Protein backbone atom coordinates (compact mmCIF):
# COMPACT_ATOMS: atom_id res chain seq x y z
CA UNK A 1 0.00 0.00 0.00
CA UNK A 2 1.35 3.43 -0.97
CA UNK A 3 1.66 6.27 1.54
CA UNK A 4 0.27 9.78 1.07
CA UNK A 5 -0.28 12.89 3.12
CA UNK A 6 -3.93 13.52 2.20
CA UNK A 7 -6.68 11.54 0.52
CA UNK A 8 -10.01 13.06 -0.50
CA UNK A 9 -12.53 10.30 -1.12
CA UNK A 10 -16.19 9.88 -2.09
CA UNK A 11 -16.18 13.19 -4.00
CA UNK A 12 -17.73 14.30 -7.24
CA UNK A 13 -14.57 15.35 -9.09
CA UNK A 14 -14.92 17.92 -11.85
CA UNK A 15 -11.76 17.07 -13.80
CA UNK A 16 -11.70 19.84 -16.42
CA UNK A 17 -9.86 17.36 -18.63
CA UNK A 18 -10.25 17.39 -22.41
CA UNK A 19 -13.51 15.42 -22.25
CA UNK A 20 -14.87 17.32 -19.21
CA UNK A 21 -15.25 14.09 -17.24
CA UNK A 22 -16.94 14.06 -13.87
CA UNK A 23 -15.89 11.25 -11.55
CA UNK A 24 -18.59 10.13 -9.11
CA UNK A 25 -17.37 8.66 -5.84
CA UNK A 26 -13.89 9.84 -6.82
CA UNK A 27 -10.61 9.91 -4.98
CA UNK A 28 -7.77 12.44 -5.01
CA UNK A 29 -4.39 11.63 -3.47
CA UNK A 30 -2.04 14.41 -2.35
CA UNK A 31 1.54 13.95 -1.24
CA UNK A 32 4.02 16.70 -0.41
CA UNK A 33 1.55 19.39 -1.56
CA UNK A 34 1.18 17.79 -5.02
CA UNK A 35 -1.78 15.89 -6.45
CA UNK A 36 -0.30 12.49 -7.24
CA UNK A 37 -3.39 10.51 -8.27
CA UNK A 38 -7.00 11.09 -9.32
CA UNK A 39 -9.47 8.32 -10.00
CA UNK A 40 -12.52 6.38 -8.98
CA UNK A 41 -13.32 5.10 -5.52
CA UNK A 42 -11.17 2.00 -6.01
CA UNK A 43 -8.09 4.26 -5.82
CA UNK A 44 -8.71 4.74 -2.09
CA UNK A 45 -7.83 1.11 -1.38
CA UNK A 46 -4.36 1.59 -2.88
CA UNK A 47 -3.27 4.34 -0.46
CA UNK A 48 -2.83 4.92 3.22
CA UNK A 49 -3.03 8.62 4.05
CA UNK A 50 -2.16 10.57 7.18
CA UNK A 51 -5.33 12.60 6.69
CA UNK A 52 -8.50 11.34 5.01
CA UNK A 53 -11.27 13.73 4.00
CA UNK A 54 -14.67 12.20 3.35
CA UNK A 55 -16.19 14.45 0.68
CA UNK A 56 -19.44 12.53 0.28
CA UNK A 57 -21.98 14.78 -1.41
CA UNK A 58 -19.37 17.43 -2.21
CA UNK A 59 -17.78 18.62 -5.44
CA UNK A 60 -14.03 19.05 -5.95
CA UNK A 61 -12.76 21.08 -8.88
CA UNK A 62 -9.59 22.88 -9.92
CA UNK A 63 -8.89 26.30 -8.46
CA UNK A 64 -10.50 29.29 -10.12
CA UNK A 65 -8.52 31.97 -11.93
CA UNK A 66 -9.48 35.62 -11.52
CA UNK A 67 -8.31 37.54 -14.56
CA UNK A 68 -9.17 41.02 -13.31
CA UNK A 69 -8.68 42.35 -9.81
CA UNK A 70 -7.53 45.50 -8.04
CA UNK A 71 -6.38 44.13 -4.70
CA UNK A 72 -5.64 47.52 -3.17
CA UNK A 73 -9.35 48.34 -3.56
CA UNK A 74 -10.24 45.68 -1.00
CA UNK A 75 -10.09 48.45 1.62
CA UNK A 76 -12.67 50.47 -0.31
CA UNK A 77 -15.48 47.91 -0.23
CA UNK A 78 -18.82 49.44 0.60
CA UNK A 79 -17.78 52.99 -0.21
CA UNK A 80 -20.15 54.53 -2.72
CA UNK A 81 -22.11 51.34 -3.21
CA UNK A 82 -25.12 53.42 -4.26
CA UNK A 83 -23.19 55.14 -7.06
CA UNK A 84 -22.66 54.41 -10.72
CA UNK A 85 -19.12 53.47 -11.81
CA UNK A 86 -17.73 56.88 -12.76
CA UNK A 87 -19.40 58.62 -9.82
CA UNK A 88 -17.96 55.93 -7.54
CA UNK A 89 -14.48 56.36 -9.04
CA UNK A 90 -14.62 60.13 -8.49
CA UNK A 91 -16.15 60.11 -5.01
CA UNK A 92 -14.52 57.03 -3.49
CA UNK A 93 -11.47 55.69 -5.30
CA UNK A 94 -9.83 58.90 -6.51
CA UNK A 95 -10.36 60.66 -3.19
CA UNK A 96 -8.78 57.75 -1.29
CA UNK A 97 -5.78 57.09 -3.56
CA UNK A 98 -3.51 59.70 -1.97
CA UNK A 99 -3.96 58.03 1.43
CA UNK A 100 -2.57 54.68 0.28
CA UNK A 101 0.90 53.85 1.51
CA UNK A 102 2.86 50.60 1.33
CA UNK A 103 1.43 49.14 4.51
CA UNK A 104 -2.15 49.85 3.49
CA UNK A 105 -1.58 48.35 0.02
CA UNK A 106 0.00 45.28 1.61
CA UNK A 107 -2.87 44.62 4.02
CA UNK A 108 -5.52 45.38 1.39
CA UNK A 109 -3.85 42.90 -0.96
CA UNK A 110 -3.43 40.33 1.81
CA UNK A 111 -7.13 40.59 2.67
CA UNK A 112 -8.13 40.38 -1.00
CA UNK A 113 -5.96 37.29 -1.47
CA UNK A 114 -7.52 35.59 1.56
CA UNK A 115 -11.01 36.35 0.25
CA UNK A 116 -10.05 34.93 -3.14
CA UNK A 117 -8.69 31.72 -1.64
CA UNK A 118 -11.76 31.34 0.55
CA UNK A 119 -13.96 31.45 -2.56
CA UNK A 120 -11.90 28.88 -4.49
CA UNK A 121 -9.62 31.20 -6.46
CA UNK A 122 -6.01 30.05 -6.60
CA UNK A 123 -4.62 32.48 -9.21
CA UNK A 124 -5.08 36.25 -9.41
CA UNK A 125 -4.21 38.69 -12.17
CA UNK A 126 -3.98 42.02 -10.38
CA UNK A 127 -3.99 45.46 -11.97
CA UNK A 128 -2.45 48.01 -9.64
CA UNK A 129 -3.07 51.55 -10.77
CA UNK A 130 -2.50 53.23 -7.43
CA UNK A 131 1.01 54.64 -7.84
CA UNK A 132 0.95 57.58 -5.47
CA UNK A 133 4.45 56.69 -4.28
CA UNK A 134 7.20 54.49 -5.73
CA UNK A 135 7.13 50.78 -4.98
CA UNK A 136 3.50 50.33 -3.94
CA UNK A 137 3.13 47.45 -6.38
CA UNK A 138 5.92 45.64 -4.52
CA UNK A 139 3.69 45.51 -1.45
CA UNK A 140 0.91 43.89 -3.46
CA UNK A 141 3.17 41.23 -4.95
CA UNK A 142 4.69 40.60 -1.49
CA UNK A 143 1.20 39.97 -0.09
CA UNK A 144 0.53 37.46 -2.87
CA UNK A 145 3.77 35.68 -2.09
CA UNK A 146 3.19 35.72 1.68
CA UNK A 147 -0.33 34.28 1.43
CA UNK A 148 0.75 31.67 -1.13
CA UNK A 149 -1.63 32.48 -3.96
CA UNK A 150 -0.40 32.36 -7.54
CA UNK A 151 -0.20 35.94 -8.66
CA UNK A 152 0.31 37.73 -11.93
CA UNK A 153 0.90 41.44 -11.82
CA UNK A 154 -0.48 43.48 -14.71
PLM regions and their residue ranges:
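Histidine-rich, glycine-flanked metal-binding segment
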Residues: 1-6, 13-61
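Flexible loop residues that form catalytic
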Residues: 16, 70, 129
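Short capping/connector residues at structural and topological boundaries
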Residues: 19, 27-28, 65-66, 94, ...
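Alpha-helix boundary/interfacial micro-motifs
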Residues: 21, 27-28, 34, 42-43, ...
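Short C-terminal domain-edge/linker segments immediately following a structured domain
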Residues: 37-44, 67-69, 83-84, 94-97, ...
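Hydrophobic faces of well-ordered beta-strands that scaffold small-molecule active sites
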Residues: 63-67, 124-126, 151-154
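Alpha-helical scaffold segments that flank or form the walls of functional sites
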Residues: 77-127, 131-149
Amino acid sequence: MKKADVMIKNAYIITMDHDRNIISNGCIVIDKDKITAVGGGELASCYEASRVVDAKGKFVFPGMISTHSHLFQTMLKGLGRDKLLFDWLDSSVRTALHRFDGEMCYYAALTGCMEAIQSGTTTLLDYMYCHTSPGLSDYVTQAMEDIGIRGIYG
